[in-house]
């Protein structure tokens, strides 16, 4: 089919004339040719070690993991995090601020979490799921991978003046709960 207006900014005129489309925008109704980038075939699954997991802002973690071997990737590359079945209580989360950024105030973000009443929240995940995260580290950093992750809270219910009774973000809650 014809390219959608939402797809056009992502391609050159030549690519559009060659029929390029975004996979997330195409409804497949007939046979089509798909080109898969070479790096997709080199995908590996690793168990990683959490090196650090500090808050760098009220609702953002700098999550640093170490993988068992170096990975060749380009800027803008991403990894997938596998989230197992789990039950995460926000009251158990450590929101210590990054010691390099706030050396004299490790509890810098606690008051904001108190004010937003985040501590009673709970995330329950009943099945293994995967989520993609863009890497904030450089390939030259070897086996350490850094992700900047924002906590995904439930929507705010203005009538109740509290969080809606829905599950918080599965992956962000899981990542926020991880400790070295």
Segments predicted by a language model, with ranges:
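FAD-binding FR-type
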Residues: 66-74, 78-180
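Signature of N-terminal electron-transfer/Fe-S-associated modules in redox systems
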Residues: 1-66, 83-84, 122-138, 147-148, ...
């Amino acid at each position: 089919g014809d390219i959608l207006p939402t797809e056009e900014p992502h391609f050159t005129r030549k690519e559009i004339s060659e029929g390029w489309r975004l996979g997330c925008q195409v409804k497949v109704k007939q046979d089509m040719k798909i080109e898969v980038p070479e790096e997709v075939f080199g995908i590996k699954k690793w168990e990683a070690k959490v090196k650090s997991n500090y808050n760098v802002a009220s609702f953002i973690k700098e999550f640093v993991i170490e993988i068992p071997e170096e990975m060749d990737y380009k800027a803008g590359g991403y990894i997938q995090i596998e989230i197992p079945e789990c039950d995460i209580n926000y009251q158990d989360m450590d929101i210590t601020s990054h010691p390099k950024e706030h050396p004299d105030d490790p509890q810098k973000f606690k008051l904001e979490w108190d004010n937003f009443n985040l501590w009673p929240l709970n995330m329950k995940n009943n099945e293994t799921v995967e989520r993609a995260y863009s890497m904030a580290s450089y390939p030259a950093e070897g086996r350490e991978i850094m992700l900047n992750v924002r906590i995904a809270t439930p929507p705010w219910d203005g009538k109740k003046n509290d969080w809606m009774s829905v599950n918080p973000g599965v992956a962000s809650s899981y990542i926020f709960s991880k400790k070295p």
